[in-house]
Amino acid sequence: MNISIESQLINYCLLFFTVVIIPIFYYIYKIVYLYLSHKLRESLINTSARIFKENESFVKQIIFTITDGVGNLRQDIMDHLQYRQTCNSIKYIVDKVFVLIDNISAIYSNTPVENYNYQYCDNITPVQPLGCGAYCPYYQPYDATFNPDCNLNYDTIYNFDFDKDIIKCDNTSECSETNETNKNTSHKLKFEYPKRCRKSRRNSRVFSRNFLKTKKSRENNSKTSTTEPFACTKDETTGMYTIKSNAYDTKNSTETNSDNNSEIVSETNSETNYSTPTTAKVNIDDVLAAMTTVYDKSDFGLNDKIKENVADSLKKMCDSSGNIKVDFDDQKLFKTVFDSVYQGLMTDPSIVDNSGYSSPTNESLNGSLTETLNESLNGSFDNSINNIKETLNKSLMDFIDCPSGSINFSNKN
């Protein structure tokens, strides 16, 4: 037979014994102790006096003195022990209070988290490629286990060595040989589109579906083993890598190369044309240069805060991979940029200057943005717009560091 006792009942019993039973036992012990000690003292004195009959009064006085001294000594010892116990108890309580205060202050302080054995993510290194057979051409070098709350070092994430981190392989047995071949050729990076590439929501957003849309396109890609849909070259003056995108076909293909390897190479076919997604690097400074004349300080009372908020607005347009997806068209591109900047400016209260000027109104700011857009497209700012168009045509990169001030515009064909 199992007997279950409620824990609450046990707690009540312990409380009852602590508050009621133990004090009663203590007082009973104290009464019995005092009574017995008194009787023993009387018996000792009377017995000693009977032994020394001729000096009975003297013996009683000596015995009383001895017993009083022993009793006082005992009481002093008990008082001292009780005092020490009280002091120790107080000391223990005070120590625990200070420990509790230290713990609370440590939890709610602004001390760097590495003091508590947490790890920063400042030096996240790119993960290695998936391998020869499973490598995807648009695979982003991210650490899949990174914590979004960590402070990511984008320079470390996005800047990696093409020679070391990407290897073009037709099959697994040719990895080492192909790697050495790539290092000895003018095109440092060559790779084919794989026959299989994992399909996921992220890939559907980042990758172009033209390569995986039909079985025919996959077969055509596998047959053109000598065609290079992407060729990566390094500019020795700037140290930047440039990816040249080649549209290719399976039959009659023509390839045109420029001297600086920066033009988009196209190959045409009478029956089927295969196009590749292009990614262009657009610098925020070029966009701001086209806006500087319109956003004059005297118009709205805005100082250099305008550039900071424009840059912040553009950065907010970046997705997790650091890219902004828009159509590769001048008008749509500029409209997307300025519309997003406009939304960022109107929703950011920090743009208002505190030097006595008034905040821009929706109508005036929208009008200036429209004016900037129209004048930019009509060629009023020839120098800035030409710089932007040259950047769109020549600086073809497959990734860019968004927080450093450069934005990616990718075309989905």
From Swiss-Prot:
Residue positions with a glycan: 46, 55, 103, 171, 179, 184, 220, 252, 260, 273, 362, 366, 374, 378, 393, 408
Superkingdom classification of source: Viruses
Record's subcellular location: Membrane
Residue ranges, compositional bias (Low complexity): 250-263
Ranges where the record places region Disordered: 250-277
Residues passing through the membrane, by range: 14-34
Membrane topology type: Single-pass membrane protein
Keywords carried by this UniProt record: Glycoprotein, Membrane, Transmembrane, Transmembrane helix
Main subcellular location: membrane
Protein name: Uncharacterized protein R474
Source organism of this protein record: Acanthamoeba polyphaga mimivirus (APMV)
